[in-house]
Amino acid sequence: MTAAVVAAAATATMVSGSSGLAAARLLSRTFLLQQNGIRHGSYTASRKNIYIDKNTKVICQGFTGKQGTFHSQQALEYGTKLVGGTTPGKGGKKHLGLPVFNTVKEAKEKTGATASVIYVPPPFAAAAINEAIDAEIPLVVCITEGIPQQDMVRVKHKLTRQGKTRLIGPNCPGIINPGECKIGIMPGHIHKKGRIGIVSRSGTLTYEAVHQTTQVGLGQSLCIGIGGDPFNGTNFIDCLDVFLKDPATEGIVLIGEIGGHAEENAAEFLKEHNSGPKAKPVVSFIAGITAPPGRRMGHAGAIIAGGKGGAKEKISALQSAGVIVSMSPAQLGTCMYKEFEKRKML
């Protein structure tokens, strides 16, 4: 068993308690399947579903609830092509002028939905994700925070054994293509169509990076909040692969935080795939430099355990991959602008 598998199993046990051992073993088997190339390739192929635009048809799970109603209204006002939603037992009714369905499968069949956003309470969110996977919705964005980690281990096991559905989240702000499609809770007005791809584990720091890249005139091509939980559906590498292949994305902002190995893995990916004269500039900020070991800092995944997952190690790994690491989130925009200026990209 590799160090990554051991670390993931330890995290599952730590987060879920001793009863998490079974879930940890399940996750370990999932990682081993990925490493052996079994089915992992099919889920990787779903990265293409991360691209959203003005033609993306979105449904909302938890449509008639308080959060679903508020954020669906915001999405409609932004111009997102929201085509309906689901609330079990309320099928056949109208909400916000759109049809309500009992199941995701029915919603997809009737509307042609290509994406779903989930605003379902934590105890039921994993079941909502699984329902979307079973309905083969291409992109599922789960906003819900506080989903039991054992539930997400099982969801991840299911995800990595198929290739039709891509999950972003949970515990994330969502994804936005400025001016075209907003799926999530981010404030639309701070975004501006532009040249920078942003990926982040932190929601509020995503907004900070967005505001700054807007202020310096660079704007954003696509912004993805991958969430702060240990077991999510999309990681840094998935998003970096999308950004590196996207001609509209000329620079990348990566915002990480303490806990796990996602940033170190991203650094290795960038070393291999973003080097040479045509490499895209990457600017990063890692939150939690002063965080004490063993204490969870906000997100379930933001914890330094067993001497691993510290900010200094992540910063060192990213710098070795040619990433410009800002020591302050307030400098992300200016760091990227200076790099564009240096490369004569303005």
UniProtKB/Swiss-Prot annotation:
The keyword Cytoplasm does not apply. CoA binds at T64, G65, K66, Q67, K90, I143, T144, E145. The keyword Ligase applies. InterPro entries: Cit_synth/succinyl-CoA_lig_AS, Citrt_syn/SCS-alpha_CS, CoA-bd, CoA_lig_alpha, NAD(P)-bd_dom_sf, SUCC_ACL_C, Succinyl-CoA_synth-like. Its EC number is 6.2.1.4, 6.2.1.5. The modification N6-succinyllysine is found at K57, K66, K338. It is found in: Mitochondrion. Gene3D superfamilies: NAD(P)-binding Rossmann-like Domain (3.40.50.720), Succinyl-CoA synthetase domains (3.40.50.261). Belongs to the succinate/malate CoA ligase alpha subunit family. Heterodimer of an alpha and a beta subunit. Different beta subunits determine nucleotide specificity. Together with the ATP-specific beta subunit SUCLA2, forms an ADP-forming succinyl-CoA synthetase (A-SCS). Together with the GTP-specific beta subunit SUCLG2 forms a GDP-forming succinyl-CoA synthetase (G-SCS). This is Succinate--CoA ligase [ADP/GDP-forming] subunit alpha, mitochondrial.
